UniProtKB/Swiss-Prot annotation:
<feature type="domain" description="RGS">
    <location>
        <begin position="41"/>
        <end position="156"/>
    </location>
</feature>
<dbReference type="InterPro" id="IPR024066">
    <property type="entry name" value="RGS_subdom1/3"/>
</dbReference>
<dbReference type="GO" id="GO:0001965">
    <property type="term" value="F:G-protein alpha-subunit binding"/>
</dbReference>
<feature type="lipid moiety-binding region" description="S-palmitoyl cysteine">
    <location>
        <position position="74"/>
    </location>
</feature>
<keyword id="KW-0564">Palmitate</keyword>
<dbReference type="GO" id="GO:0005096">
    <property type="term" value="F:GTPase activator activity"/>
</dbReference>
<keyword id="KW-0539">Nucleus</keyword>
<keyword id="KW-0734">Signal transduction inhibitor</keyword>
<dbReference type="InterPro" id="IPR036305">
    <property type="entry name" value="RGS_sf"/>
</dbReference>
<keyword id="KW-0597">Phosphoprotein</keyword>
<dbReference type="InterPro" id="IPR046995">
    <property type="entry name" value="RGS10/12/14-like"/>
</dbReference>
<dbReference type="GO" id="GO:0008277">
    <property type="term" value="P:regulation of G protein-coupled receptor signaling pathway"/>
</dbReference>
<protein>
    <recommendedName>
        <fullName>Regulator of G-protein signaling 10</fullName>
    </recommendedName>
</protein>
<feature type="modified residue" description="Phosphoserine">
    <location>
        <position position="41"/>
    </location>
</feature>
<dbReference type="InterPro" id="IPR016137">
    <property type="entry name" value="RGS"/>
</dbReference>
<feature type="modified residue" description="Phosphoserine">
    <location>
        <position position="24"/>
    </location>
</feature>
<comment type="subunit">
    <text>Interacts with GNAZ, GNAI1 and GNAI3. Associates specifically with the activated, GTP-bound forms of GNAZ and GNAI3.</text>
</comment>
Amino acid sequence: MFTRAVSRLSRKRPPSDIHDGDGSSSSGHQSLKSTAKWASSLENLLEDPEGVQRFREFLKKEFSEENVLFWLACEDFKKTEDRKQMQEKAKEIYMTFLSNKASSQVNVEGQSRLTEKILEEPHPLMFQKLQDQIFNLMKYDSYSRFLKSDLFLKPKRTEEEEEEPPDAQTAAKRASRIYNT
């Protein structure tokens, strides 16, 4: 359940959704604005879907992607109003990130205090202390390294830049015809 929300929160916005304040599309200009905003605080980075995506890519390379995924799952959990959904999400967060058998266990103090019994009576802030620990871990450890990484320093190439030159496309087509015959 929260995995869909995490995916939704961290999905990169398509270039057509990126606009300057006047509504005109300007992905290169917006990218510079975004990276400046991301550099100002981890909070700003986590509010921007493209920022979250790049930060996730960075954390994946550092083998600590579970930290941002846990943080996002907790944010989604806090917004849940339906009690049954809250119970399901609480159990999923616990089983995915906090239990001894968790597939993506985060390193936080106090996780053992959360038990299955507590999960039956969830409340929106039940993971807050653990989420704060992970936020601080990211803020004072991973975030500073991210700001020095290529994922932050080098702007994403636009689709036009990523297209192959015409000669390479023609050569690739010729090669595919040779191997397909």
